[in-house]
Regions:
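A short secondary-structure junction motif
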Residues: 12-20, 49, 72, 99, ...
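Active-site segments that bind and position negatively charged phosphate/pyrophosphate groups
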Residues: 24-134
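A glycine/threonine-rich phosphate-anchoring loop and its flanking beta-alpha core
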Residues: 1-34
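C-terminal charged capping/lid subdomain of soluble metabolic enzymes
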Residues: 125-178
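Generic alpha-helical structural context detector
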Residues: 7-14, 67, 94, 117-118, ...
Length: 178
């Protein structure tokens, strides 16, 4: 559930990032607008939704989060052109998967959540990065490589970084990232 919320937040940031500067057809424009609800619902309800989940309750906050995870992301994924579905956050996730033990210890949405922070840093959105970092931390999604048990060693991270910048999710972004 927690990791699903991390992946849902990414839908908003990646859709807006990858669509930046493009003239969108109707369906992609509508999908991008729906992606706003992916982030807004999780930002608004995450804390209470996690509490309800922990108590085994299906209250309003839990329901709103589940709808964002399933309905909103599904609508966005099916409405926008494929090139607007993923960007740097997912590319970072797939790079992290190459590091031994990471995929076994963390869920996809955990890694994508961390990837959002990298995307925001690369894009120079420090104010938004701070807010998202705080949100992810409150959801117990890792916000540093250290929290994932990954050494900050350039040689060790080389394959991860290479995969992150050369993967298919990086083919349609507003500027080159190397």
């Amino acid at each position: 559930f927690r990791a699903g919320m991390g992946d849902t937040i990414a839908k908003y940031f990646e859709c807006h990032f990858s669509a930046r500067g493009d003239e969108l057809d109707y369906h992609s424009a509508l999908g991008r607008e729906i992606s706003n609800l992916c982030y807004e619902r999780i930002r608004t309800y995450a804390g209470k939704a996690l509490a309800e989940f922990g108590e085994g309750k299906a209250g309003e906050a839990f329901t709103q989060a589940v709808l964002a995870i399933t309905v909103n992301t599904g609508l966005v994924s099916h409405m926008v052109e494929d090139c607007y579905n993923c960007a740097l956050a997912h590319a970072v996730c797939y790079g992290l998967d190459l590091i031994p033990g990471v995929a076994e210890r963390f869920l996809h949405g955990d890694l994508v959540g961390y990837g959002i922070l990298i995307q925001l840093a690369v894009d120079g959105q420090s104010g938004t990065l701070a807010k998202v970092r705080k949100l992810l931390k409150s959801m117990e999604i890792p916000v540093t490589l250290k929290e994932m048990g990954v050494a900050l060693d350039k040689e060790f991270l080389r394959d991860m970084l290479k995969e992150s910048v050369s993967g298919p999710d990086m083919e349609h972004i507003p500027y080159p990232v190397t």
